[in-house]
C-alpha cells in the first residue's frame, strides 16, 4: 500500500499486516510499484492528486472533503469507472499534536478500483 502523503504522521505508530510504502519523492513525478494507494492528501491540491491517481490506473482511496463531490472534474473522471464513495455518519476528528480537532467540513472516501461496486455508501 502506497501512502505518498503521510510523512511523519500518526500512521507511523501502527503496524499493518501488509507493507506500507512511503517515499520522500514528488508524488506527481514518481512511478513506483504498488498495489493500492490509500491516503489523506493535501486538500489544496486535491484535483491534481485525483487526476494523478486516475492516470496511474491502480486502485486508490482518498479521504477528501465531501464538497469535492460537487466539482465538475469528479463526474468526468469517475463517470465510466468502478467507483465507490464512502460517507461516514459523523464528522471525523483528526489528531494534531495530541489534540483532537473537529474539521469545519465533512469528509468522505473517494475510491476507484476496489471492486466494491459502483455506488455511494453511507456509513
Report each predicted region and the residues it spans.
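Class I S-adenosyl-L-methionine-dependent methyltransferase catalytic core
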Residues: 1-123
Amino acid at each position: 500500500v502506497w501512502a505518498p502523503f503521510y510523512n511523519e504522521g500518526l500512521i507511523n505508530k501502527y503496524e499493518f499486516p501488509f507493507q506500507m510504502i512511503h517515499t520522500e519523492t514528488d508524488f506527481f513525478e514518481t512511478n513506483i510499484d504498488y498495489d493500492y494507494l490509500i491516503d489523506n492528501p493535501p486538500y489544496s491540491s486535491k484535483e491534481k492528486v485525483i487526476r494523478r491517481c486516475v492516470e496511474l490506473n491502480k486502485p486508490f482511496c482518498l479521504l477528501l472533503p465531501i464538497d469535492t463531490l460537487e466539482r465538475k472534474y469528479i463526474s468526468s473522471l469517475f463517470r465510466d469507472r468502478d467507483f465507490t464513495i464512502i460517507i461516514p455518519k459523523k464528522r471525523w476528528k483528526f489528531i494534531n499534536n495530541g489534540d483532537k480537532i473537529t474539521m469545519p467540513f465533512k469528509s468522505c472516501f473517494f475510491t476507484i478500483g476496489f471492486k466494491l461496486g459502483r455506488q455511494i455508501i453511507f456509513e
